[in-house]
Design a protein with these regions (language model features):
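Catalytic, metal-anchored helix/loop core of enzyme active sites in primary metabolism
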Residues: 1-123
Length: 123
């Protein structure tokens, strides 16, 4: 049964590839697929992404910038995996929301969100 073990292995071993014992997924042999509702309580970053999409405006830009900052910090062992969501959520609350941003607003939002996320990491 497919699950997230292989994509997670790829993420942790990047840019190298670790040989795995996972059976290859053969779509020709699959008779049916089952999809479940994502658990946004368990996967907080997914809930934050949905919130950003719902709010629209520059919010997805804020989430993306904060996420890039925390992923980099995580890869450098400067933040825990579970701590990443806190920084993203706090960045969402601190950077000014713009309902109908211009291109210049997006550029400024990205810069500000990165600055805020970095300052939250160092506090």
């Amino acid at each position: 049964m497919p699950d997230m073990r292989l994509p997670i292995q790829y993420a942790f071993s990047y840019p190298e590839r670790v040989k795995s014992s996972f059976e290859r997924l053969d779509f020709a042999r699959i008779t049916d697929l089952t999809f479940e509702q994502p658990d946004t309580k368990r996967f907080r970053n997914l809930a934050l992404a949905y919130e950003a999409l719902y709010r629209a405006g520059n919010m997805p830009c804020i989430v993306n910038a904060a996420n890039e900052v925390v992923v980099d910090a995580f890869l450098k062992d400067k933040i825990s995996f579970l701590g990443m969501s806190d920084v993203i959520e706090r960045t969402m609350g601190k950077v000014a929301y713009i309902k109908e941003p211009t291109y210049e607003d997006y550029v400024a939002t990205d810069t500000e969100a990165r600055r805020v996320a970095l300052s939250l990491l160092s506090s």
